Regions:
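A general structural signal for well-ordered alpha-helical segments in protein cores
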Residues: 13, 45-49, 63-71, 103, ...
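Conserved core of the PLP fold type I
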Residues: 57-189, 202-219, 223
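N-terminal small-domain helix-loop-helix segment of the aminotransferase-like
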Residues: 2-98, 105
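PLP-dependent aminotransferase class I/II
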Residues: 221-284
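Donor-nucleotide binding loops and adjacent catalytic segments primarily
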Residues: 182, 195-198
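The start of beta-strands in P-loop NTPase/AAA+ ATPase cores
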Residues: 31-33, 164-165, 194-195, 221
Length: 284
């Protein structure tokens, strides 16, 4: 019997075939202080551990439910020292399997081949691969040296070319560059056709959040991403949030699965939100 030639596997979309996969250097580093990941160094609140230990085993067999979680997130924001100048509805809060999943969903919902993703350089490394999956063109404006200052005028100029999405990491990972709330709102107001996404994963460490003052009715092209990974120590459970105009949140959530956030993450999130004092102590 003659040998048959191997049959090649089906090709993916051209955008995926050209894509260089994004991977984090995880292997062989457990138990080490991984400063490049900026992980919480003391772990989550004891309330989180207690809630997970009490999680009913029979609930593992059923799909997760999210009743009350959006309300708890909003209540947590309202109770913070900065508060909320404009109330949020539950339709303005999206739940995601970590902020990475939210970033992916934003690009999937809003990016098309040939569209431009505008961002800075260096910045969080997952923005560009997500844009590449959709065939978008990435325009990365370098930070200003010395000091890695935010390239405000260059971003203003680039927005005149009407990019599809502007991704702002504030404060920026890895440079720590900060952009004032006033400048974030200015950029969003100057580019109504551009979705301006503010990744606020580290905002608790600087207090630069736009959430306390933004009116999403006025800045309907602004979307804010948050997580409980860094501050509350839930990185291993993967839960993130998006805040914005209800229509934008709806569009982004349409491209996600109905059960992307698992039940243990939901349980941990409720517990972490109920013990804000623990998180505040860690951040301080």
């Amino acid at each position: 019997m003659g040998m048959t030639a191997p049959i090649p596997s089906p090709s993916a979309r051209p955008e995926v075939e050209r894509l260089r996969g994004y991977s984090a250097p995880l292997e062989g580093r457990r138990g080490l202080l991984r400063l490049d990941f900026n992980e919480n160094t003391i772990g989550p609140s004891p309330a989180v551990a207690e809630a997970l230990r009490a999680f009913p085993a029979d609930q593992i067999a059923v799909y997760p439910e999210y009743d009350g979680l959006r309300e708890a997130v909003i209540a947590n924001l309202q109770a913070s020292p900065a508060g909320l100048a404009y109330p949020l509805s539950i339709e303005q809060v999206g739940l995601f399997n970590g902020v990475d999943a939210a970033i992916h969903a934003v690009i999937h919902a809003y990016g098309a081949p040939g569209d431009t993703l505008l961002t800075t350089s260096p910045t969080f490394g997952y923005y560009a691969p997500c844009a590449g999956m959709q065939g978008m063109v990435v325009e990365a404006v370098p930070h200003v040296l010395p000091g890695f200052r935010f390239p405000l005028q260059q971003i203003r100029d680039a927005l005149e070319r009407r990019p599809r999405v502007l991704m702002l990491c504030n404060p920026n990972n890895p440079t720590g560059t900060r952009l004032s709330v006033e400048h974030v709102l200015e950029l969003a107001a100057s580019a109504p056709d551009t979705l301006v996404v503010v990744d606020e994963l580290y905002e608790a460490f600087t207090g630069d959040s736009v959430l306390p003052t933004v009116d999403f009715g006025l800045h309907s092209n602004l979307l804010v991403l948050r997580s409980l990974a860094k501050t509350s120590g839930l990185a291993g459970l993967r839960i993130g949030f998006a805040f914005g105009h209800a229509d934008v949140v709806d569009r982004v959530c349409r491209v996600t699965g109905p059960y992307d956030v698992n039940s243990l993450a939901v349980t941990a999130a409720f517990a972490a939100l109920s013990d804000q004092a623990y998180t505040d102590h860690y951040v301080a």
